[in-house]
């Protein structure tokens, strides 16, 4: 995960357009309503609101002020207080002083490569960034279910390439991961080495069996079972191609031929260089 974060910092710092023109969609879960915010900012992040009967839970709040303004305006229209903010992978800004994180994530986001990445973002994006979340942090052990705003949230260990991030099963229906399993090529921010292919594949198979019917990502928004099945097959094919020890040029050609016209093809050559070292 450290290599991925460093790569993200370098790539995103090169693009400082942060004006948000995001969009929202809603999905009815078992006992709650899920509101999805697509920021359309430089990070292409997605943020989430889980609306219970009397209160809200915010997950992965936006990082930029323009996005946060849109997000907060939408929240106010819902007319319910924010009970808790959940930070799984992305530290942002939110009004709640009660913060929940998966086990180990609080320390991880406050030191080493993650702290350096956020410092780099601050230097690049300056005042366009929100003040990062501060409050009383509660960490949730993996395998534990907690109840927030009257809704169950189960925290399971996420894929090893995203550790210490968690897979969070929301209301027995929606599984939040770092990357939604959408029908597109992976890039070097998701998969940075041959080893991480197997880790990501193992994580998706765990997500398939977690009880969810939709899968969410901090990047990519909402994916259905067809998207999940595609991504499992896609990573399985990458694993098979790598087993033959191809050079980067051969691997890139083979992957493009296996998935012609698939979104994200412009990043396949860079992916091949990373995986075929």
Regions found by a protein language model. Name each.
Residues 4-13:
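Sec-dependent N-terminal signal peptides
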Residues 10, 18-22:
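Boundary at the C-terminal end of the N-terminal hydrophobic targeting segment
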Residues 21, 247-277:
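C-terminal regulatory/interaction regions
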Residues 23-77, 166-179:
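Conserved beta-strand hairpin/beta-sheet module of binuclear metal-dependent hydrolase folds
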Residues 58-62, 81-105, 175-180, 210-221:
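Active-site neighborhood of phospho(di)ester-bond hydrolases with catalytic His/Asp-centered motifs
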Residues 73-145, 242-243:
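Active-site HxH/HxHxD metal-binding segment of metal-dependent hydrolases
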Residues 138-200:
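Ligand/cofactor pocket segment of small-molecule handling proteins
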Residues 197-254:
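Divalent-metal (often Zn2+) His-rich catalytic cores of metallo-beta-lactamase-fold enzymes
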């Amino acid at each position: 995960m450290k290599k991925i974060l460093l790569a993200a910092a370098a790539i995103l710092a090169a693009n400082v357009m942060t004006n948000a023109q995001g969009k929202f969609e809603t999905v009815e879960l078992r006992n709650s309503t899920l509101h999805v915010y697509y920021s359309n900012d430089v990070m292409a992040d997605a943020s989430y609101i889980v609306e219970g009967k009397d209160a809200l839970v915010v997950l992965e709040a936006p990082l930029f002020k323009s996005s946060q303004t849109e997000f907060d305006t939408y929240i106010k229209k819902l007319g319910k207080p924010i009970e808790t903010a959940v930070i799984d992978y992305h530290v942002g800004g939110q009004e709640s002083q009660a913060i929940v994180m998966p086990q180990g994530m609080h320390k991880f986001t406050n030191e080493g490569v993650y702290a350096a990445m956020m410092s780099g973002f601050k230097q690049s994006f300056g005042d366009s960034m929100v003040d990062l979340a501060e409050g009383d942090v509660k960490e949730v052990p993996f395998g534990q279910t907690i109840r927030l705003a009257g809704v169950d949230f189960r925290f399971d260990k996420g894929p090893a390439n995203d550790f210490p991030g968690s897979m969070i099963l929301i209301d027995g229906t929606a599984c939040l991961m770092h990357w939604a399993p959408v029908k597109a090529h992976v890039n070097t921010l998701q998969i940075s080495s041959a080893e991480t292919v197997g880790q990501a594949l193992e994580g998706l198979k765990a997500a398939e069996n977690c009880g969810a019917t939709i899968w969410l990502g901090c990047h990519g928004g909402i994916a259905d079972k067809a998207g999940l099945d595609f991504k499992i097959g896609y990573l399985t094919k990458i694993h098979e191609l790598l087993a033959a020890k191809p050079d980067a040029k051969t691997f890139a050609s083979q992957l493009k031929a296996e998935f012609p016209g698939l979104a994200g093809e412009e990043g396949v050559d860079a992916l091949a260089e990373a995986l075929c070292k």
